Amino acid sequence: MSSQADYDKRLAEEVGSLSTRLVTAVNKQVELEETILELRKQVSALKLKNEQLNQSDIKLKTILPKYIKLQDDYRETLTKKKEAESQNTKLQGEVEDLTASLFDEANTMVSNASRETHNFKIKNRKLYEELDEKNIIINDLQEQLQDLKQMFIKMEEQSKIQSYSQSNTPKIESSTDFNETNSIHTNTNFSESKLSKYNTRSTLGDEESQNYNLQQLQRIIYSPLITSIRFDLNNYNIDFKGFVYQLIKPDFQFDLSHLKTIPFFKSIWQSEIENCIHYIPSLPATTTLLNRWQKGKTFWGSLIEGKVSIEPIKGSNETFKLTYKGNNASGNSSNENTESISNRSSATGSVVPVAIKDPCTFCGEARNDSLEHCRLYHLKLFESNTANNSGNNSTNQDQQGNNDNTHVIASYPLCNYCLIKLRNLCDFFAKIRLIRSNIFKLKQNDSFDEFIVVPGSFGQFKRSNTISNRNGTYSSSSTSSSSTSSVSSSSATTANGESLNSTTHNIQLERTEESKLIKLYIMMLLIRSKIFWSKLGFWDTIDQINEINLDEIHYEAFSYLIPKPTQQQQQQQGDIRSQSNFNSPRQSVDGRSVLSGSISSPRQPNLDKQQKDSIVDETVAQLQRDGVVRSETASAEEKFEDAISDETNGQEQLRSEKLQTGKTVTEPNSVSESEPVQEPEQVRSKSNNNTNNKNKDTKIEDSDAEHTFSLKRSHSKQFKDQLNKELDQTLEMLAENIDFDESSNGNGNGN
């Protein structure tokens, strides 16, 4: 048993020693595995570094030659820079020498100019002395003329006031009291005593029948709808559109004389606006002599430019219309209105209407029996800082008010009848200024320029054109009457034909553009209808008038009113397009040659306007068939209108023959540009040498064929046109003033 125990003990010891060895071996193995992992990581890191080094080595091999090349280039640029700096220093020296020489030349030129200016100053001083002497004479004459004008003005005003007070207005009752400030204060006794006589009709008949009659009388007299307005007539398609596109041009001078050259405005002016104000009052003696002499032009110019203000005598004058309906209302309502005014006036003294004792300046209304006859407002005319500069008109004039006004020229009392008329007139010109400012951003369009007829407004002051040449002076006054009459008759025929819609012109526009124009047209129709009704006379209270507010309607809504083109119009437009692409010359109705199609010449960019004008001339000739079409360009017609209008019918035939000759010369080299306009001296010399012999005509044609394209335009023609324009404006001003004086004298004699 002891041996067995020893044996077990030894086995146990041996097992313990083996287990310890096994544990130590396992620990060593774990440590070795960890070292192996670390070594593997180091190997992988070294491999990555090796790959990076290999790539960098490859890049270095590729970049090294480039670097060497860049170094060489840098050395070359340094050498070039040194050379450029040396050249720059040389050039700077040359520039300094040139500047010194230029300064010397400039100093010599300045000294010469100073000498010339000194000489001119001496001459101008002498001229100023002569002008001063003449101005003294002119001032003496102006003082005499001013005294005469004041005497005539006083006589005219006295005769007007007497005629209106005797014929149109009753005498003021003795019971009416005026204060020292020429004002009327309405109270309870005044309103009851003056309005009691109209209450007798309210007691007649039954109350129900009276209400029925009142309901019948409270209906609209005549009021068309917007959808009933026609937009297929020439008064909209041609006249109004041409007026709008002419008005929004930047170079258009916004004043009365230039507005009256547009047919649309001229027709409205003659038939609707000018007859609104039958009598234009004189300006006070504090204004200048020119303004007093041009009282009509000053008055209408102030309305057009917005330099007027219509203000009540007292603030309460604007509120009395809310309760007061005048004599046209029924007796009961009149009593109620009178009682309300009296109660309000007795309760608060600040709402009492105040009137002026003086009669109305424009119609002579002097009655004081009711509030609608009293002068509760006054019109103020302002003078701007730029009043004397009539040509500098811009969109800043569209702002109506007193911001740019300096002082009041005159103040006139107004009755309610003239108040409504003048308010509508001011609104009319405000709408025109609104169109002028182009608030709807309309695009510039020259398609309607050919339909804008500019008639002569002062024929009796038309100057006879005289052109001097080497042989002497030739006057065209003998032949001006026949040519002027023929031109005026042809223009009148064209205007009347288009006004009667015998010839329709349908110029296509964009849909948005057309809708904007329709809104503007309806806006003008609205204010024109208000002017018409104001001339007839009506009471402008809010509950008595139905008016549309166009500002609440967007312009896109008016696109539904655009008329659709008919089948005939579409076919006609197709014919016009096909004719515009026709490239061969053709003969017009009167035998004149018209050049159409493509024009090939070195001056092609400058002939776009002439091509458009020639195509339009062809279409107009085909549509009218009996009209006369000019073959000259539009620019030539504008520059030499006076010279061409003074020629006789035989000279016009000669000009057409010359154009045909020029056509035959240019046909071999395709169609060239249109015939240049000849100088007026050559035209008149040829007109003197022109006789009825056919041999001389052929000689003139041959000479013209040789020298037609060698003519050059002179800058003196532009100066001549400018002088003619200024002279025409002064003559037109004189004509308007004489017309106003004659009309005022005629009204005074009639009364």
UniProtKB/Swiss-Prot annotation:
Residues 574-587, 595-608 have a biased composition (Polar residues). Keywords: Coiled coil, Cytoplasmic vesicle, Guanine-nucleotide releasing factor, Phosphoprotein, Protein transport, Transport. Residues 694-709 have a biased composition (Basic and acidic residues). One of its GO terms (biological process) is hyphal growth. It holds the Pfam family Sec2p. GO terms for molecular function: guanyl-nucleotide exchange factor activity. Residues 326-346, 469-499, 565-724 are annotated as: Disordered. InterPro entries: RAB3IL/RAB3IP/Sec2, Sec2_N. Residues 22-162 form a coiled coil. Guanine nucleotide exchange factor for SEC4, catalyzing the dissociation of GDP from SEC4 and also potently promoting binding of GTP. Activation of SEC4 by SEC2 is needed for the directed transport of vesicles to sites of exocytosis. Required for filamentous growth. This is Rab guanine nucleotide exchange factor SEC2.
